[in-house]
C-alpha cells in the first residue's frame, strides 16, 4: 500500500503581469524579503497590492509628503490587468513609469493611463534609500 501525498498547492500567478508566481515576484516585496530594485518593480508591486487589498504596502511605498490620510481599500474595484508602457530613470533618485491599468467598477470597464513619478530616498534617517511613489499625471481621459 502506498502512502498518499498531500495535494500540491497551485502556484498563484502574480497580478503584476510579469508571468511569475506571486511568492517569487511581488510577494517577496510585500513580505519584506526584498526591496524593489527600481521604480518599475515598485509600481508593479503597488498594482499587485491594490489587487490584493494590501493597503499597508501601498501606504508604506507612498512618499509621506503626498500620501492621503484616508487611504482605504476599494472593494468595489476589480482590477483586470496591467501594462507598463515606459520606465525612465532621470538620475539615481528620480524615475517615471507610464502604465495602463484596466479595471471594472459596477460592471463597467475602465482604463487608468498614468505617468507616475518616483523618488529614491531613505524612509527614516540612517536607513538605506528605497523607491517611493510621489504622484502621477493622467494621460488622456479615463475610459
UniProtKB/Swiss-Prot annotation:
SUPFAM superfamilies tied to this protein: NTF2-like (SSF54427)
Q: What is this protein called?
A: UPF0225 protein Reut_A0143
Q: Give the originating organism.
A: Cupriavidus pinatubonensis (strain JMP 134 / LMG 1197)
List the InterPro entries hit by this protein, alphabetically.
Answer: NTF2-like_dom_sf, SEC_C_motif, UPF0225, YchJ-like_M
Q: Which PANTHER family match?
A: ADENYLATE CYCLASE-ASSOCIATED CAP C-TERMINAL DOMAIN-CONTAINING PROTEIN, UPF0225 PROTEIN SCO1677
The family note in this entry says: Belongs to the UPF0225 family.
Against Pfam families, the record matches this protein to: SEC-C, YchJ_M-like
Annotated transmembrane regions: none
Amino acid at each position: 500500500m502506498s502512502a498518499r501525498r498531500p495535494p500540491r498547492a497551485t502556484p498563484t500567478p502574480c497580478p503584476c503581469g510579469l508571468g511569475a508566481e506571486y511568492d517569487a515576484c511581488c510577494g517577496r516585496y510585500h513580505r519584506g524579503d526584498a526591496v524593489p530594485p527600481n521604480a518599475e518593480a515598485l509600481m508593479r508591486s503597488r498594482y499587485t497590492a491594490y489587487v490584493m487589498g494590501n493597503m499597508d504596502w501601498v501606504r508604506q511605498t507612498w512618499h509621506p509628503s503626498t500620501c492621503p490620510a484616508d487611504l482605504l481599500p476599494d472593494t468595489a474595484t476589480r482590477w483586470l490587468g496591467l501594462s507598463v508602457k515606459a520606465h525612465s530613470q532621470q538620475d539615481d533618485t528620480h524615475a517615471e513609469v507610464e502604465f495602463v491599468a484596466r479595471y471594472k467598477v459596477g460592471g463597467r470597464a475602465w482604463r487608468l493611463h498614468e505617468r507616475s513619478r518616483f523618488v529614491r530616498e531613505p524612509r527614516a534617517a540612517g536607513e538605506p534609500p528605497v523607491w517611493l511613489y510621489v504622484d502621477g499625471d493622467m494621460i488622456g481621459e479615463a475610459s
